[in-house]
């Protein structure tokens, strides 16, 4: 969002232009922001949510811009779950592939247990953790997405709405939040 530099001198974006970003977390029941962080526009989306903390057992649904191993570690240490699109160049090892139902209407195309590999995963301390990698058909857009999660049932119940709108479903006692 563009702002006037003479009023918001802290929000310098370019030499003669000011800008801010509003990083939000949406409450899944009310669809209203429950956490807001206003920052200068040059701060990355990922860094804009560093201070977001959620109640235990929250399922946090993030877009690929928040795909960050240290963020994953933080979410797991806070006893929360994550669902996010996996980056195409992510180094991982497939440990086990799960059978899928014979139902042709089933939108999950692949479900596997994985371990993240590489120096970045090792440095973040998540190289020994088990994740699920799920390939999902997003019917509204006619394309596949590849997701990584710590709670596979959450992905299955929430995935339809990750990119089609801002409504996220609850699973069990956990609630789903979206950082945007």
Predicted feature descriptions by range:
Residues 2-180:
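Single, function-defining residue in the core of a domain
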